[in-house]
Amino acid sequence: MGGDKENLDLSDLNASLPAAAAALSAEDRAGLVNALKDKLQSLAGQHTDVLEALSPNVRKRVEYLREIQGQHDEIELKFFEERAALEAKYQKLYEPLYTKRYNIVNGVVEVDGGNDEPASENAAEGKDADAKGVPDFWLTAMKTNEVLSEEIQERDEPALKYLKDIKWARIDDPKGFKLDFFFDTNPFFKNSVLTKTYHMVDEDEPILEKAIGTEIEWYPGKNLTQKILKKKPKKGSKNAKPITKTEVCESFFNFFSPPQVPDDDEDIDEDTADELQGQMEHDYDIGTTIRDKIIPHAVSWFTGEAVQAEDFDDMEDDEEDDEDDDEDEEEEEEDEDEDEDDEEEKSKPKKKSAGKPKLPSKGGAQGGADQPADCKQQ
């Protein structure tokens, strides 16, 4: 067994990972792999120590359980493959609908009767009467979402008004997915498409390896992710020119400059690894929100209907939690009442009994149970 321990590497953990991967899939969360190699190797050593501590008979049973787990993982692998094929099939069915949406949003085509329909009494006169398509469609849709609204700063909005479409697609080499943001010609940057790509460790395990974003070609003085501070020189200073300092500030466009994992994980201490993992999870949360919520249901976010639907779901979850809390409180009250009854019985003077002793009450006493700076318009 000692030799096995020395030869154990990360690949020996694969048999124990699918269950964790499934949990991550349910919550749609991402893990930071490179920074956790040391922890995984430590777990590998613990895994070997556990087996060594078992008696031969128990160890044999555990090994058989691991064989059963391997059979389970093979079935799970087929599930992942079939799910990917099913998603690809329906993605093709969605595409024509997304094309129609693009054409309407950007004024490429007009909806039948769109120019003839009388305006409602609540419609703002002349505000968008001459506008093509649906102005600020994607900006409004994203701002309505709670996760994305925290990322979009006021100074980002003029640039995001030029956003024409958002698409996503799976990638195969390496496995993962990408988001494409299509922009009209604008005064902020040269790029017509900004892309964010997520590389996954394995095609079947939603564990994030790294994220890559397009380098934005900002026009001079238009970089929304930076603010320029000018400080006047001190009186009597030989340098009469103002001191200029550039600082990174909060902006939605920081999404295209994701946190990077160092190639050598030995350079990362535990606190830095935890901070980096939090940043990557947040970045992945933004990406999957756009992929899974905004793109497929954009008009519902534009109108606010999606928020109402999410609020309704949250209310149902809260009601279930409240019911569980009420049940717990009732059980605690019953336990307290039973404890009080027991105390009263104990405090009463005992009488001699010629018969059998009374059994204790069935309800006996129970045991108790660094952020970037805010940017102002340059």
Swiss-Prot record:
Keywords: Chaperone, Coiled coil, Cytoplasm, Lipoprotein, Methylation, Nucleus, Prenylation. Residues 306-378 are annotated as: Disordered. The keyword Lipoprotein applies. The modification Cysteine methyl ester is found at C375. Residues 376-378 form a propeptide. The acidic domain is probably involved in the interaction with histones. This is Nucleosome assembly protein 1;1. It comes from Oryza sativa subsp. japonica (Rice). The lineage of its organism: Eukaryota, Viridiplantae, Streptophyta, Embryophyta, Tracheophyta.
